[in-house]
């Protein structure tokens, strides 16, 4: 490895076995023969590299790119490949170094080695078809080559974390324990130390992703295969290079396509494959086939572009390790005797500071560069933090990724403070973000770098506010880097909390409690009362018994129990009597006492308590403005127990004030919390004032890196997209095999959307498409798709989508990724698909008939007799089309006409009579059989009621569920012609709670009245079931709130 960080690691793996050949004695005796004897003119023309990794000179000057004092490691790689004019080649010095000790005093060992080589009947031959290979005779050399010292000390422990000391070694691997059984040892069969062992511990490098046995790490160091360089030495006299060279690594498995020929890599039997199929760069991620027609010699020396994320990667040429200065003997002799101990101590402190930071950053300014610092809290989100840390090390320079469990962010921010256009990504919860913002305040960086958030764990209200979502699922890190790079910089208000003793109370009346808050600055909220009391109980219990709080589910259960207990005890009921709140000179105490608030929140951002919006949208209330996180105002909100409960279903608290300064006085010890950190504060006077504004990165909906959105001509007016659904079982088992997962998907239908349609809008159209398909898939109409290859029609899935379905991103090269529902408005349809959309349904039941032909289907409709007039092209177009624009096809009037066109009919066929009899008698098996034989679910009984009316009245939940799954959607709210009652009215009158829940979950109307003006809730109350009435009322209120929020958002 030279000072510029060159690295061409191409030699630790053996080439494919060639035909057996008897070696010549002269070439087999010395490493020179191994290097020059096999490197012929045709071999050089093929661009192959041959050398003996066991030789010391080969380690330093060969194609592996090892350290070289002259700084020509990469250049030697080229000489070794071409052969050069000198017949001894790149390994000549190594050969001489090994032959001289042999001729000097080890004649017997040399003869023994010669005899061993003569008796050998098999020898590997360099393949001319391979671009990068080696001779493969290194395993015949002595375990410790002649001339090299044998290490007698204890085995070196594999390094798992970066070394930031002055002893750091460039190109050192970061080994992580792994249990991957499919990856073969990187050394290959010839050099693997435990090749005959059935099972051995393995390690995987987090930076270059090679896998070796733990026992083989020492052998890997002997052949000097280095990881990609992360810095450069500061003492080198060689001129500084402003570019980075490729770091080539052999791969037995490789995703994507070859950069040269555009073809995929052969991986049909990759699990057990021992052949090297690709050569890829650890920096730019380019990959080539391992053959001369694809990977050529000039690729070794060419500069690396650092790939798609070059703008955020910190190149190793920027990071310099400073050598400790050494005093000469003359200078030490001329030192004068010190007379001041104080001065000596000061110098010692300076030396300690210099020793702790032997690295400096010397960036090259460029307006296109946005270098990124990543801080990961591994303790957030269970094991998510550790996985995210490893993924960022693979995509970026490991020296720009920091583990907050090892050290805080201060040293890293201090080291990178002079880097222009710096951006920061905080991977953790809101507390991690606050920690980084406080350090930025302390360092007073100018300009302050903006901070993005990758939310881990739960809560994450600040991340939700900045459009990063409520938690990380499995979104590709590559897309996250693009989003951080293209994100919009916004400001976030930060507020000071100044605490003093309450001057109105004498010291002897102060109660027990702490005298200061856990934080003196907050970014999200500051609250007191009920919510802080519950959080405080949880923290105190966890500190007393930490072993009982090792599960997220247990933590949630404790929170729920503590909240319920506090509700019964009403410990915060007298909060309004012991506080005084003054906002910008306005005393809010009388209003607080009148409404008897049990919780008061000072809110800076719109989100609170894991995504709720307590301020809501003021709408017509002209006294208040919509909430913003950058307006210099803080919102004051009061909560009663009722409004706190309504908060979870879309409600909001009582808006009190929007102000710039708050004066809060407490007259007893009250539980409080600052950004989730609770305490019980003694009576105090708290002053809240604006501190400053921090720069944050907000996830942008329109990403500038997408050429689709930059070029208006590339955005089509309309897109015709097929929708396919995938079960959770198939997703978990096949998400790394896109072809098999595509084959396992089941088609839903076809949508026609606008070119700029986002996923949030697309979700509504998919739900409508599902309703139409449910209507058409009744007994009289069956929808099929046609296999493009076999032309055989097969029935579409009639199973309803569960409310928990989500979109899948199918554009990544390696696998499918789930998209968080809260971030659907940030993604366009064109960003996740080209001609088809995949959705994941976690509750989908996989049947034996489930499956999809390899070709994508087209919809074909099998018409039933008597309905040819109803099934017309206009109606079919309405079923299949999703207009991303407002068209008449989905207007309310059309939907009403569509519903009334499916009128009930009297039973005609024998199968219709059988279905009616099965519903009346509660025979589910007979119902299923009659429906499969062609019976219709749109028939009426003697009382002019639908089948769903009869099933709801009898209380047979299985039959109700079957009709809901297979019948048309209009059956839900179809009214009885005599009484005007729906199926939900019937179930409420009979007090069938399970049936009522099925109907409500299916979307039955809760506000539709019968001929007497009664709703289902009122019918349940008249039937003497107040619990059922309360349930229906709560569901009705929930839907009303959801509807109001939808209108507000629009």
Swiss-Prot record:
Q: What keywords were assigned to this record?
A: ANK repeat, ATP-binding, Cell membrane, Cell projection, Cytoplasm, Cytoplasmic vesicle, Kinase, Lipid metabolism, Membrane, Nucleotide-binding, Nucleus, Repeat, Synapse, Transferase
Compositional bias segments (type: Low complexity): 92-105
- Limits of the DAGKc domain: 367-502
Q: Where in the cell is it found?
A: Cell projection, Axon; Cell projection, Dendrite; Presynapse; Postsynapse
InterPro entries reported for this sequence: Ankyrin_rpt, Ankyrin_rpt-contain_sf, ATP-NAD_kinase_N, C1_DGKiota_rpt1, C1_DGKiota_rpt2, DGK, DGKI-like_dom, Diacylglycerol_kin_accessory
> What tissues is it present in?
In brain, expressed in the hippocampus and cerebellum with stronger expression in the Purkinje cell layer (at protein level). Expressed in kidney.
Report the GO terms under cellular component.
axon terminus; cytoplasm; cytosol; dendritic spine; excitatory synapse; glutamatergic synapse; guanyl-nucleotide exchange factor complex; neuronal cell body
Q: List its EC numbers.
A: 2.7.1.107
What segment(s) does the record annotate as region Disordered? 53-74, 92-111, 328-356
- Looking at the UniProt entry, the stretches that span the membrane are none
| Broad class of enzyme this protein falls into | transferase
Pathway annotation from the record: Lipid metabolism; glycerolipid metabolism
Q: What happens when the gene is disrupted?
A: Homozygous knockout mice lacking Dgki do not display overt phenotype. They are slower to habituation to a novel environment, but have normal levels of locomotor activity, anxiety, and motor coordination. They display a small increase in presynaptic release probability and synapses show a reduction in metabotropic glutamate receptor-dependent long-term depression.
- Annotated signal sequence is none
Q: Name one GO molecular function term.
A: ATP-dependent diacylglycerol kinase activity
Gene3D superfamilies per the UniProt record, alphabetical: 2.60.200.40, 3.30.60.20, Ankyrin repeat-containing domain, Probable inorganic polyphosphate/atp-NAD kinase, domain 1
Q: From the UniProt record, list the reaction(s) this protein catalyses.
A: a 1,2-diacyl-sn-glycerol + ATP = a 1,2-diacyl-sn-glycero-3-phosphate + ADP + H(+); 1,2-di-(9Z-octadecenoyl)-sn-glycerol + ATP = 1,2-di-(9Z-octadecenoyl)-sn-glycero-3-phosphate + ADP + H(+); 1-octadecanoyl-2-(5Z,8Z,11Z,14Z-eicosatetraenoyl)-sn-glycerol + ATP = 1-octadecanoyl-2-(5Z,8Z,11Z,14Z-eicosatetraenoyl)-sn-glycero-3-phosphate + ADP + H(+); 1-octadecanoyl-2-(9Z,12Z)-octadecadienoyl-sn-glycerol + ATP = 1-octadecanoyl-2-(9Z,12Z-octadecadienoyl)-sn-glycero-3-phosphate + ADP + H(+)
- Source organism superkingdom: Eukaryota
- Chain intervals with Basic residues compositional bias: 332-347
- Physiological role: Diacylglycerol kinase that converts diacylglycerol/DAG into phosphatidic acid/phosphatidate/PA and regulates the respective levels of these two bioactive lipids. Thereby, acts as a central switch between the signaling pathways activated by these second messengers with different cellular targets and opposite effects in numerous biological processes. Has probably no preference for any of the diacylglycerols in terms of the acyl chain composition, especially for the acyl chain at the sn-2 position.
Q: Which PANTHER family would you find in this protein's record?
A: DIACYLGLYCEROL KINASE, DIACYLGLYCEROL KINASE IOTA
Subunit field text = Interacts (via PDZ-binding motif) with DLG4; controls the localization of DGKI to the synapse. Interacts (via PDZ-binding motif) with DLG1. Interacts (via PDZ-binding motif) with DLG2. Interacts (via PDZ-binding motif) with DLG3. May interact with RASGRP3; involved in the regulation of RASGRP3 activity.
Instruction: Quote the protein name from its UniProt record.
Output: Diacylglycerol kinase iota
């Amino acid at each position: 490895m030279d000072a510029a960080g060159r690295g061409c690691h191409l030699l630790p793996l053996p080439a494919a076995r060639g035909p057996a050949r008897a070696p010549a004695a002269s070439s087999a005796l010395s490493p020179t023969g191994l290097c020059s004897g096999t490197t012929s003119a045709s071999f050089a023309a093929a661009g192959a590299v041959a050398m003996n990794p066991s030789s010391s000179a080969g380690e330093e000057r060969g194609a592996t790119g090892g350290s070289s004092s002259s700084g020509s490691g990469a250049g030697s790689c080229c000489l070794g490949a071409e052969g050069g004019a000198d017949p001894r080649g790149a390994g000549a010095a190594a050969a001489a170094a090994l032959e001289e000790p042999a001729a000097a005093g080890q004649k017997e060992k040399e003869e023994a080695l010669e005899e061993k080589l003569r008796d050998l009947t098999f020898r590997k031959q360099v393949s001319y078809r391979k671009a990068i290979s080696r001779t493969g005779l290194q395993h015949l050399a002595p375990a410790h080559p002649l001339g090299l010292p044998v290490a007698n000390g204890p085995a070196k422990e594999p390094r798992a974390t970066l070394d930031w000391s002055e002893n750091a070694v460039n190109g050192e691997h970061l080994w992580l324990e792994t249990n991957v059984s499919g990856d073969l040892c990187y050394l290959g069969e010839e050099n693997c130390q435990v090749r005959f062992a059935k099972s051995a511990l393995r390690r995987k490098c987090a930076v270059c992703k090679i896998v070796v046995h733990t026992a083989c790490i020492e052998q890997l160091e002997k052949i000097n295969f280095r990881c990609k360089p992360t810095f450069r030495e500061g003492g080198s006299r060689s001129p500084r290079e402003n570019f980075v060279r490729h770091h080539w690594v052999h791969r037995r498995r490789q995703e994507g396509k070859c950069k040269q020929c555009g073809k995929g890599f052969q991986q049909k039997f990759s699990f057990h494959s021992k052949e090297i199929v690709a050569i890829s760069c650890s920096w730019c991620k380019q990959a080539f086939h391992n053959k001369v027609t694809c990977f050529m010699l000039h690729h070794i020396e060419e500069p690396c572009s650092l790939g798609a994320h070059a703008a955020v990667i910190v190149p190793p040429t920027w990071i310099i390790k400073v050598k400790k200065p050494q005093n000469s003997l003359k200078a030490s002799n001329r030192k004068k005797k010190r007379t001041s101990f104080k001065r000596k101590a000061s110098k010692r402190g300076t030396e300690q500071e210099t020793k702790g930071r032997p690295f400096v950053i010397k960036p090259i300014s460029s307006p296109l560069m946005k270098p990124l610092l990543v801080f990961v809290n591994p303790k957030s989100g269970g094991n998510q933090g550790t996985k995210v840390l490893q993924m960022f090390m693979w995509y970026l320079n490991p020296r720009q990724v920091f583990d907050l469990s090892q050290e805080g962010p201060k040293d890293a921010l201090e080291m990178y403070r002079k880097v222009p256009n710096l951006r920061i990504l905080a991977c953790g919860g809101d507390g991690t973000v606050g920690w980084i913002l406080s350090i930025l305040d302390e360092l007073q960086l100018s300009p302050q770098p903006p901070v993005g958030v990758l939310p881990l764990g739960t809560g994450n209200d600040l991340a939700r506010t900045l459009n990063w979502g409520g938690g990380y699922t499995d979104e590709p890190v590559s897309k996250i880097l693009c989003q951080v790079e293209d994100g919009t910089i916004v400001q976030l208000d930060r507020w000071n909390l100044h605490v003093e003793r309450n001057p109105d109370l004498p010291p002897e009346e102060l109660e027990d409690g702490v005298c200061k808050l856990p934080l003196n600055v907050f970014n999200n909220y500051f609250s007191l009362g009920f919510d802080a009391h519950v959080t405080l109980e949880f923290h105190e219990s966890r500190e007393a018994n930490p072993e009982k709080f090792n599960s997220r589910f247990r933590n949630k259960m404790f929170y729920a129990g503590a909240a319920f207990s506090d509700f019964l005890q009403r410990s915060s009921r007298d909060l309004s009597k012991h506080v005084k709140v003054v906002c910008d000179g306005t005393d809010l105490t009388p209003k607080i006492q009148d409404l008897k608030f049990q919780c008061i929140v000072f809110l800076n951002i719109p989100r609170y308590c894991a995504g709720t919006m307590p301020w809501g949208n003021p709408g017509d209330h002209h006294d208040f403005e919509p909430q913003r996180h950058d307006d210099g105002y803080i919102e004051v909100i009061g909560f009663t127990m009722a409004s706190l409960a309504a908060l979870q279903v879309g409600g909001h608290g009582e808006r009190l004030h929007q102000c710039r300064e708050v004066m809060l006085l407490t007259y007893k010890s009250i539980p409080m919390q600052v950004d989730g950190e609770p305490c019980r504060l003694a009576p105090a006077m708290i002053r809240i004032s604006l501190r400053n504004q921090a720069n944050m990165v907000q996830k942008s909906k329109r990403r500038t890196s997408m050429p689709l959105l930059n070029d208006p001509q590339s955005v089509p007016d309309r897109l015709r997209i097929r929708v396919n659904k995938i079960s959770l079982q198939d997703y978990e088992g096949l998400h790394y095999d896109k072809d098999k997962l595509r084959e396992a998907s089941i088609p839903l239908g076809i949508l026609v959307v606008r070119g700029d349609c986002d996923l949030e809008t697309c979700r509504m159209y998919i739900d409508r498409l599902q309703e139409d398909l449910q209507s058409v898939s009744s007994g009289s109409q069956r929808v099929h798709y046609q296999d493009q290859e076999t032309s055989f029609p097969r029935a579409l899935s009639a199973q309803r989508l569960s409310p928990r379905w989500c979109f899948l991103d199918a554009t990544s090269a390696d696998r499918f990724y789930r998209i968080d529902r809260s971030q659907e408005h940030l993604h366009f349809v064109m960003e996740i698909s080209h001609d088809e959309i995949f959705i994941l349904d976690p509750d989908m039941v996989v049947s034996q008939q489930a499956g999809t032909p390899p070709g994508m289907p087209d919809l074909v409709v099998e018409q039933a007799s008597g309905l040819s007039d109803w099934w017309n092209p206009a109606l079919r177009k309405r079923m299949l089309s999703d207009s991303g624009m407002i068209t008449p096809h989905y207007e309310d009037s059309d939907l009403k006409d569509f519903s009334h066109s499916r009128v009930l009919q009297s039973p005609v066929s024998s199968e219709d009579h059988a279905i009616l009899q099965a519903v009346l008698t509660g025979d589910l098996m007979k119902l299923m059989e009659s429906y499969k034989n062609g019976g219709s679910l749109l028939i009426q009984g003697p009382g002019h009621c639908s089948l769903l009316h009869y099933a709801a009245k009898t209380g047979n939940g299985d039959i109700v569920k079957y009709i809901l799954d297979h019948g048309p959607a209009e059956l839900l709210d179809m009214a009885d012609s005599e009484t005007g009652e729906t199926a939900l009215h019937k179930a409420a009158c009979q007090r069938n709670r399970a049936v009522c829940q099925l109907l409500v979950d299916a979307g039955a109307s809760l506000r539709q009245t019968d001929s007497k003006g009664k709703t289902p809730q009122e019918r349940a109350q008249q039937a003497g079931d107040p619990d059922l009435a309360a349930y229906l009322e709560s569901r009705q209120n929930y839907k009303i709130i959801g509807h109001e929020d939808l209108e507000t958002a629009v």
